[in-house]
Regions:
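Gram-positive cell-envelope targeting signals
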Residues: 155-163
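Two-component histidine phosphotransfer core
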Residues: 1-137, 141-145, 149
Length: 163
């Protein structure tokens, strides 16, 4: 399998997963998937950067929602950088958001574990450098917003840790 794919392929894969989950949980949540802008479609990205974050949002962000759950994916281009926003209306606390931000900074959570989110953050930083990676904040919907930050083009780096 390739380590890098076009963003359009990565989005297609993630959206297939999201549609399956949307049909499973249709009674208790809505999943809104924006169309990938044309200028972002050919960007090369590391594989599996979106689907695991969707899975996290469904399991941890919205897992306890009995009804009216919302998960939304949107895109933005600003100053030569590209952003993918994954937002939910889960009931995350400010303390948990802060712990998530700290684990990205430290490269491990408080238990010393490297989570899928940390792995994605590291791979994005390796590939793009600079300001690339994940950002975590409060969503406009009240839950968590995880933003994937991409630079214009990445560099071809070999993967040493395929853990």
């Amino acid at each position: 399998a390739q380590d890098y794919v076009e963003l359009s392929q990565e989005v297609d894969h993630a959206y297939c997963y999201a549609r399956i989950q949307a049909s499973r949980f249709a009674a208790r949540m809505e999943i809104r998937l924006a169309e990938l802008p044309e200028e972002m479609q050919k960007l090369k990205v590391p594989r599996l950067i979106i689907q695991p974050l969707l899975e996290n949002a469904l399991e941890y962000g919205l897992g306890d929602k009995e009804e009216n759950g919302l998960l939304a994916v949107s895109y933005e281009e600003k100053d030569g950088r590209f952003y993918i926003h994954l937002e939910d209306n889960g009931s995350v606390t400010e303390e948990v958001l802060e712990k998530m931000r700290e684990s990205l900074q430290n490269g491990a959570n408080e238990k010393g574990e490297v989570t899928g989110m940390i792995n994605i953050h590291r791979r994005l930083q390796l590939y793009y450098g600079g300001m690339a990676g994940l950002e975590i904040k409060r969503s406009v919907f009240g839950g968590t917003c995880v933003t994937i930050c991409l630079e214009g083009e990445g560099k071809d780096v070999p993967f040493a840790d395929r853990g």
